[in-house]
Amino acid sequence: MTEVIRVKSEQDLDAAFNIREQVFVQEQKVPRDAERDQYENIAKHYLATYDGVPCGAARWRQTENGIKLERFAVLQNYRNKQVGEQILKAVLEDVKAANPEKEVYLNAQLPAVNFYKRHGFVEEGDMFTECDIKHYKMIFKG
C-alpha cells in the first residue's frame, strides 16, 4: 500500500533526496548540481512509501507564475504501482487547499506527458530541453 506524507523530518527529507539522486542523477544522468538547487529550503517536499519502503518523492514551490510542481521521482521497482499517481494527488490536494486561485504548472519529461494529461494537465508551448531531457510545460486545468 502507498502512503504519501509531507516531509517534516530530516530523515524523511534525506530519503526523498536519495530517491531523487537514484532517479535523476544515476538513472537519467542529470548533473548532481542541477538536481539540487537553491529552492530546496523553500519548497514543500513529499515522500511516498510502498509497504513502508521509501520509493517516491516530489516537491512544490511558489513562483511569480503560480505554483510549480517539481522533482517527481519514483524508483524503478515501484513504477506502474500507482505510486506517482498517489504522490500527484497528495501534492495537488495540498496545493489547491493552500492556493486555490493560483495557476499550477510543471515541466513534464516527454515520457510522463500522457500521465499528466490523464490527471488534468494540458501542454502549453513548444517542447524544450533541460539537462538533455525533453520537456513540455503543462498547466493544471482540473
Q: For each predicted feature, which ranges?
A:
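Conserved acetyl-CoA pyrophosphate-binding loop and the N-cap/start of the following alpha-helix
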Residues: 78, 82-90
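C-terminal "cap" of GNAT-fold acetyltransferases
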Residues: 109, 129-142
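Short acidic/glycine-enriched loop/turn segments that link adjacent beta-strands
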Residues: 40-42, 65, 130-134
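Conserved acetyl-CoA-binding loop of GNAT-fold acetyltransferases
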Residues: 117-127
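Short amphipathic alpha-helix that is part of the acyltransferase structural core
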Residues: 1-45, 49-51
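Conserved GNAT acetyl-CoA-binding A-motif
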Residues: 95-108
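Conserved beta-strand in the GNAT
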Residues: 47, 53-61, 68-73
